[in-house]
């Protein structure tokens, strides 16, 4: 199925390649580079690119393109999901998935890829199993391997492969038994110039860190599970139980894993946590324009909005900007025309604002449309959809584990039109 995998950085350099069947020439990536040049942003490169003799399927994560080469027609989502699994595995092994880290651990990377695919078909994609096959790198293990010439490949068959629960190894033991869950929601929204919501959607995930002895059986229930649409589960979740009772019942993998991802559509009246007041004016036959924006909390349930960053691509006719922020720092690049304002936390009693004038090109006509304002922010201990975990129960073991739930909302593509 998958013949080759190429890892390409944002500069267009191929820094790693892996072939499972026959060697595919790097020249096949020329079709990908052409599509990359046509795309305005890296995220806009088509995920499927047909060529005369191959198909190129790609994902873009952590400023790296993971490009799979196939020669026969296969379901594209199948390959794309596998590529995402490769990225998640690298992140689990090395802590971060970046070009320098992959280069530093290139031997382990090749060993992991060799186990994940067998003759081009996915074989072992569970992190628990892979870590028994290929030991994660440590400083001590790296030094020993360098001296002795050994590898990270394990010398025993993974116990999980022989179990009815392939995602969990047997014989797990911990001194402190704990289960923590993070509910992370990302809100994508477009707000028109009057402040009305054009569209708003929430993409959410529940990430888990489970370190429990033995073979625990967990159930996780929600206060309002009907909010969730398009739910995608980890294989450990019993789907029939979810369909009938809207309860998550599962034997968890050991360690960190993504329990589920979900989507909340605009039909459920997505709450907008921030608002932007703006007054941006360009005058005809004038060399000055007015710029004024204020950011404030809207529906945050009393929680603090942190890490606020405002960016805006100004029109070509703007030569410079003389602005004064009431809070934070700002920069304007006269070459790229990009305005950036690092706000930080929002104090509801003293709303941050950015005011000043714009120097415009002499004789330039008024822009066809005002610039769009892009926001980034995060809110701790809040799931903006209103999703709440009701309780977590454990069966099959007699000890009492430590349990914890954290919530976080952050901005995805959050745009305000002016």
Curated annotation (Swiss-Prot):
Q: Which InterPro entries match?
A: Adaptor_comp_med_subunit, AP2_Mu_C_sf, AP_mu_sigma_su, Clathrin_mu, Clathrin_mu_CS, Longin-like_dom_sf, MHD
Q: In the UniProt record, which is one GO cellular component term? A: Golgi apparatus
According to the entry, every stretch annotated as the MHD domain falls at 176-417
Keyword Transport recorded? yes
Q: What does this protein do?
A: Part of the AP-3 complex, an adaptor-related complex which is not clathrin-associated. The complex is associated with the Golgi region as well as more peripheral structures. It facilitates the budding of vesicles from the Golgi membrane and may be directly involved in trafficking to lysosomes. In concert with the BLOC-1 complex, AP-3 is required to target cargos into vesicles assembled at cell bodies for delivery into neurites and nerve terminals.
**Source organism of the structure:** Homo sapiens
State the SUPFAM superfamilies in the record.
Answer: Second domain of Mu2 adaptin subunit (ap50) of ap2 adaptor, SNARE-like
Q: Which UniProt keywords apply?
A: Cytoplasmic vesicle, Golgi apparatus, Membrane, Protein transport, Transport
Gene Ontology annotations of biological process type: anterograde axonal transport; anterograde synaptic vesicle transport; clathrin-coated vesicle cargo loading, AP-3-mediated; endocytosis; intracellular protein transport; intracellular transport; synaptic vesicle coating; synaptic vesicle recycling
Q: Which family does it belong to?
A: Belongs to the adaptor complexes medium subunit family.
Q: How does it assemble?
A: AP-3 associates with the BLOC-1 complex. Adaptor protein complex 3 (AP-3) is a heterotetramer composed of two large adaptins (delta-type subunit AP3D1 and beta-type subunit AP3B1 or AP3B2), a medium adaptin (mu-type subunit AP3M1 or AP3M2) and a small adaptin (sigma-type subunit APS1 or AP3S2).
Localization annotation: Golgi apparatus; Cytoplasmic vesicle membrane
Q: Which gene encodes it?
A: AP3M2
Protein's name according to its UniProt entry: AP-3 complex subunit mu-2
Q: What is its main location?
A: Golgi
Q: Does the keyword Acyltransferase apply?
A: no
